[in-house]
């Protein structure tokens, strides 16, 4: 699933996480998808498994690229906010409200960065399952 049209709200981490959860639906359902669309040997003649695997491959690639873009975009936005708050903090060391905002943004940035690790695990799992079922029917392009 691609990201919703328009820009992604990176301000609230809970919304960011919810968006990623929705965008990871294809990965969460890959086993079911493969079981219902890629035939076993006994049903091989009834469905074009190579076309089905190709379509699933393209959907997975699009979802992974889209999520990677969303995560990295939010990391960049939050990093810019942290940088700005640090600069303000250097000018005004006594402002406790500013310090709290800085700490909050730094924490959010760390959580967003950890989503890159989660993404790697999710992607690896999906490709492992995909390759187990589709390697006989479809060979992905070498450049991807």
Curated annotation (Swiss-Prot):
Residues crossing the lipid bilayer are: none
Asked if the Swiss-Prot or TrEMBL record annotates the protein with the keyword Transit peptide, the reply is no
Does the keyword Acetylation feature in the UniProt annotation?
yes
GO CC annotation terms, alphabetical: mitochondrial intermembrane space; mitochondrion
Q: Which keywords has UniProt assigned to this entry?
A: Acetylation, Coiled coil
Q: At what positions is N-acetylalanine found?
A: 2
| InterPro entries given in the database record | MIX23
> Which residue spans adopt a coiled-coil conformation according to this UniProt entry?
82-120
Q: Which domain of life is it from?
A: Eukaryota
At what positions is N6-acetyllysine found?
100
A Pfam family (short name) is: MIX23
Which PANTHER family does the UniProt entry name for this protein?
Answer: COILED-COIL DOMAIN-CONTAINING PROTEIN 58, PROTEIN MIX23
Similarity comment: family membership: Belongs to the MIX23 family.
Q: What is this protein called?
A: Protein MIX23
The scientific name of the source species is Mus musculus (Mouse)
* Protein's gene: Mix23
């Amino acid at each position: 699933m691609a990201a919703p049209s328009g820009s992604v709200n990176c301000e609230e981490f809970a919304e960011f996480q919810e968006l990623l959860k929705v965008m990871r639906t294809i990965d969460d359902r890959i086993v079911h998808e493969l079981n219902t669309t890629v035939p076993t040997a006994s049903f091989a003649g009834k469905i074009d498994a190579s076309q089905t695997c190709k379509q699933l491959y393209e959907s997975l690639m699009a979802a992974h690229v889209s999520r990677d873009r969303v995560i990295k975009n939010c990391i960049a936005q939050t990093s810019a906010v942290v940088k700005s708050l640090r600069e303000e903090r250097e000018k005004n060391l006594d402002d406790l409200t500013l310090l709290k905002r800085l700490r909050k943004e730094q924490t959010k940035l760390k959580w967003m960065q950890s989503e890159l690790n989660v993404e790697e695990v999710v992607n690896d799992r999906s490709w492992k399952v995909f390759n187990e079922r589709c390697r006989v029917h479809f060979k992905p392009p070498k450049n991807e």
